[in-house]
Structures are given as C-alpha cells and as structure tokens.
Amino acid sequence: MPTRRPRVTDSGFASAGGQRLDTALAARGLARSRTSAAQLIASGLVTVDGRSALKPSLRVRTEQLIEVASSDHYVSRAAHKLIAALDAFPVTVAGRTALDVGASTGGFTQVLLERGAVAVIALDVGHEQLAPSVRADERVVVVEGVNARYLTRESLQALAPAAAASDLVVADLSFISLALVLPALVETVGLDADFVVLIKPQFEVGRGGIREGLVTDHALREDAVSGVLWSAWDLGLPTAGVLSSPLAGSAGNCEYLAWFSTAAGSNPTEWSEQVSAIVRA
C-alpha cells in the first residue's frame, strides 16, 4: 500500500502537523497578535525557510525559520511603536528638542527627526549601537555609556549642551523599571516636558510573575501599567494617554505606551478602566 504523502499547499509547503503560521508569528514575538500576523502574511512580508508564505493557516514546525521582511526604511521595529503613540496622542514634535532615553539603534530618534524635531539627544547606556544613517543626521547628539537612572540636568548638559532646551522625552528601556528612571528624567528636563514612554511589564513585575520570559497574567500586566502611571503621578506627572503597542516585544511580551503631561493629564484613577480594557483586549 503506497505511503500517503503530506498535503502540499499552493506555495509548495508540506502542511502536515505543526502550528498555524499566524499563531506561530504571534508566539515568536514577530507579530502583536494573530490578526496583525494575518495582515503581515497578506502583505507578502512573511517567509518560511526563505520561501514566501501567503496563508495564515499554513502549518509550520518549531524548527522552521520564520522571517518578516522589513516593509519600510526604519532602523528598528521599535519605530512603529512610537509612531502609534504620536498618531494617537496630540503630542507636537516639530520644532522641539527631544531626549530619547534608551535610543539603541535609533528607531525612536528616527521618528522624531522625521516629525520635525530640531534636535534629538540620543542617550543609551551602551556604545556604538546607533545606526549610522541616524547618527549622521546633524540634528542628533549622541550620548553613550550613560545610565539614565543616574542622569541629572547638570551631567546631561555637560555632555550635550543642546539638552538644555529639551521639552520632549521618549523612552524605550529594558532590564530596568521605569519607576527607577522617571525620577531622574523629571529632575533632568522638568515637569513642563511631554513624556512618551514604552511600558514593558516584564521589567516592571518581579521574577515570580514571569514564565519562560513572558508575563501572561492579565492582572500582573495591568498592575505593571498602573504602577508606572502612579510612579509618574507621584513625581507630578499626570497621565494624558495610554494605549497598547501595535507590536509585541522581541520575546512576545505585550507592551504599552503612556503619555504624561502636566498640561493635558489627569489622575491615574481616571484611567483605570481604560488600562484594564487595553490589557485584557
């Protein structure tokens, strides 16, 4: 009796066994959700083992390589997180001097430049991470090897005199709680600045709340977001906006963006229902 061969899709992939492609994309942190994964697939941006994959239902195995092609010119996928925030929050960038904390390769910095910032201080604890194309922009002032937790107005201005005019702060930090960094940022730029920060629950909850690198408990994620909002409030920064990041973190963690502004914000209590809805969506 002849051996039954696995069914082959119209893309030429054997589809027996394995996990759905859209599910795998979300599980591997390559897409925010199965819905966004399906959009990436439909756009022709996804390949499996180097071959174009056009169906969300395609079955893939753990050992197969899934890649999402870059569909734009940004130096990092983090750029799309800040774009989502600036599209949702009425934060003016044009004509302002911005401080990008945790600049890394420069995705946030790149977005700020494209939106008309007159100067961006790209600060990071690491060295030589900023993409050459971003570093080459004359409006960028690179500050490397500086831990934002210990930043002061004087120390930053000594390294970057242009920072004296900073009135917009964006932050994308890893391996440290925002609650530990916000006090230094407020002291450095003052309360009149707008703050747009990326909240990563995996760095806000304790180790006990993380399973295989992920914060899967909705209550813990909600506590993480609320905790950052209250930390900002205690420093004199009201909450003016909260949203879910359009992209998951590199390990698949859900992330969130918050806007703090003394001119437009309010007590975090007024945001509790929205935070809960966003986290549990």
In which residue ranges do the predicted regions lie?
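A basic, amphipathic helix-loop patch mediating RNA/tRNA/ribosome contacts
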Residues: 7-64
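Conserved class I S-adenosyl-L-methionine
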Residues: 93-104, 112
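Residues at the N-terminus of the alpha-helix immediately C-terminal to the conserved SAM/SAH-binding loop
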Residues: 104-109, 126
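Conserved S-adenosyl-L-methionine
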Residues: 111-119
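S-adenosyl-L-methionine
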Residues: 121-180
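A short glycine-rich, Lys/Arg-flanked "PGG" loop and its adjoining helix->strand segment in the class I
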Residues: 179-196
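Short, glycine-/aromatic-enriched active-site segment of Class I SAM-dependent methyltransferases
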Residues: 201-217
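Flexible, glycine-/basic-rich loop-and-beta segments that form/coincide
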Residues: 254, 261-281
